[in-house]
């Protein structure tokens, strides 16, 4: 059984994205990129390092995945807004107490980036939808 280690690398701004990504690629078989504005603004730079290195990225949201990742669990921000609005209405009308109200979620859709999957020779799992565009 192969031993796995976790390594956390973070980028504070766009000036260090390439060096942080290179360090992650050198150390990792796969990377996870959370939902992050710096990553979202630098997907091309990230892809230009990870793809040639053969390191797939699992991403925290569809926009980042469409630029540099292989897969994500995508949510609809519109649907999330509707759910949040309904929760707010319950609070404002007195139907719910914010301190005891359960958290509500929207469904996530498994999606993959067909271009990067093909470049890396990765076959997406059944049930994953291709990211369009």
Predicted regions and their residues:
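Short, small-residue-biased leader/transition segments that mark boundaries at the very start
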Residues: 3-8
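Structural motif
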Residues: 12-24
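Solvent-exposed loop/turn segments at secondary-structure junctions
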Residues: 14-16, 36-40, 63-66
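Glycine-rich, charge-decorated loop segments at or immediately adjacent to ligand/cofactor-binding or catalytic sites
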Residues: 19, 65-74
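Periplasmic-binding protein-like
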Residues: 28-40, 57-60
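Venus flytrap/periplasmic-binding-protein-like
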Residues: 42, 46-69
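Hydrophobic alpha-helical segments within soluble ligand-binding/sensing domains
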Residues: 75-96
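Hinge/cleft segment of the Venus flytrap/periplasmic-binding protein
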Residues: 90-133
């Amino acid at each position: 059984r192969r031993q796995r280690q976790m390594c956390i690398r973070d980028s504070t701004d766009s000036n260090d994205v390439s060096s942080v990504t290179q360090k992650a690629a050198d150390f990792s078989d796969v990377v996870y990129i959370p939902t992050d504005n710096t990553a979202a603004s630098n997907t091309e730079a990230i892809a230009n390092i990870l793809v040639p290195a053969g390191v797939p990225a699992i991403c925290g949201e569809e926009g980042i995945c469409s630029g540099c990742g292989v897969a994500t669990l995508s949510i609809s921000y519109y649907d999330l807004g509707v759910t949040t609005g309904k929760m707010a209405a319950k609070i404002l009308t007195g139907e719910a107490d914010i301190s005891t109200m359960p958290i509500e979620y929207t469904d996530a859709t498994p999606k993959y980036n067909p271009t990067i999957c093909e470049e890396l020779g990765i076959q997406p799992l059944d049930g994953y939808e291709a990211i369009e565009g």
